[in-house]
């Protein structure tokens, strides 16, 4: 069931083939400060999936706040998150022309359009 005022987000990026093991390892123990910054920015139900044939990372999350741009700016300004991105951005290849890394004016991850949703209900 949807949380009122929830924005669903899906993003993609390419994972460098040589970075698969390191990327999975660092995400097995995400730094607490990074998670805290996401939580302060009203990000919930966040997951990243890997599709090996295309080396595609697919991130899904829900935003439950009221000012998405301001909350994303607060994440980008968080020192622990900036250190995290300094490590993880080098493992990825953006699909966005001109992108230089996370937290800049040009998005690093590509946001993709939702074309179907079924929420159903538990029986």
Predicted region positions:
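Terminal substrate-recognition subdomain of acyl/acetyltransferases
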Residues: 111, 115-122
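Solvent-exposed residues in well-ordered beta-strands and their adjoining turns
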Residues: 14-16, 62-64
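Short amphipathic alpha-helical segments
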Residues: 19-44
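Active-site-flanking beta-strand signature of metal-NTP-handling nucleotidyl enzymes
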Residues: 8-14
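Short beta-strand
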Residues: 47-51
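An amphipathic, aromatic/His-enriched active-site/gating alpha helix that lines ligand/cofactor pockets
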Residues: 37, 41, 63-108
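Eukaryotic N-terminal low-complexity, Ser/Thr- and Lys/Arg-rich leader segments
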Residues: 1-4, 120-123
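A generic structural motif
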Residues: 55-61
């Amino acid at each position: 069931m949807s949380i009122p005022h929830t924005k669903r987000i899906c993003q993609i990026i390419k994972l460098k083939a040589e970075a698969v093991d390191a990327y999975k390892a660092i995400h097995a123990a995400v730094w607490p400060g990074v998670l805290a910054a996401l939580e302060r920015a009203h990000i919930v139900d966040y997951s990243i999936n890997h599709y090996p044939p295309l080396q595609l990372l697919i991130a899904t999350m829900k935003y439950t706040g009221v000012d998405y741009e301001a909350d994303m700016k607060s994440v980008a300004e968080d020192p622990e998150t900036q250190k995290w991105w300094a490590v993880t951005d080098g493992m990825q290849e953006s699909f966005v022309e001109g992108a230089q890394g996370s937290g800049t004016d040009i998005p690093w991850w590509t946001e993709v359009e939702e074309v179907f949703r079924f929420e159903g209900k538990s029986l």
